[in-house]
């Protein structure tokens, strides 16, 4: 079982927001998450992102793989995903 840190789509039609979650890689996009690590609101005037960095570091140390989109969001917001990867 491979575990990934990725986005889970929420919200209404044309007004999405995303939760940053830990999921089994075989789970569907909107499936059951193991743990929620934060959120990302792309539609707001000021795009909001909040992440529990300590929990993310813990999951990465356990072998969780970041999705490409989550890596991009972390790099854009200076949260240094690369320095957290094992």
Curated annotation (Swiss-Prot):
In terms of superkingdom, the source organism counts as: Bacteria
Gene Ontology cellular component annotations, sorted alphabetically: cytoplasm; small ribosomal subunit
Q: Which UniProt keywords apply?
A: Ribonucleoprotein, Ribosomal protein
The Swiss-Prot or TrEMBL record annotates one GO molecular function as: structural constituent of ribosome
Signal peptide extent: none
Fetch the InterPro entries from UniProt. Answer: Ribosomal_bS16, Ribosomal_bS16_CS, Ribosomal_bS16_dom_sf
Q: Which GO terms describe its biological process?
A: translation
Query: Which PROSITE patterns does the UniProt entry name for this protein?
Result: RIBOSOMAL_S16
**Pfam family example for this protein?**
Ribosomal_S16
Question: Which HAMAP family does this one have?
Answer: Ribosomal_bS16
Q: Which family is this sequence assigned to?
A: Belongs to the bacterial ribosomal protein bS16 family.
Name it.
Small ribosomal subunit protein bS16
């Amino acid at each position: 079982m491979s575990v990934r840190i990725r986005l889970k789509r929420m919200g209404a039609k044309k007004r999405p927001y995303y939760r940053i979650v830990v999921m089994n890689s075989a789970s569907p996009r909107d499936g059951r998450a193991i743990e929620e690590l934060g959120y990302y609101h792309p539609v707001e005037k000021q795009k909001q992102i909040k992440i529990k960095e300590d929990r993310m570091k813990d999951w990465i140390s356990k072998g969780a793989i970041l999705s490409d989109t989550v890596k991009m969001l972390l790099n854009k917001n200076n949260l240094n995903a690369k320095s957290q990867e094992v």
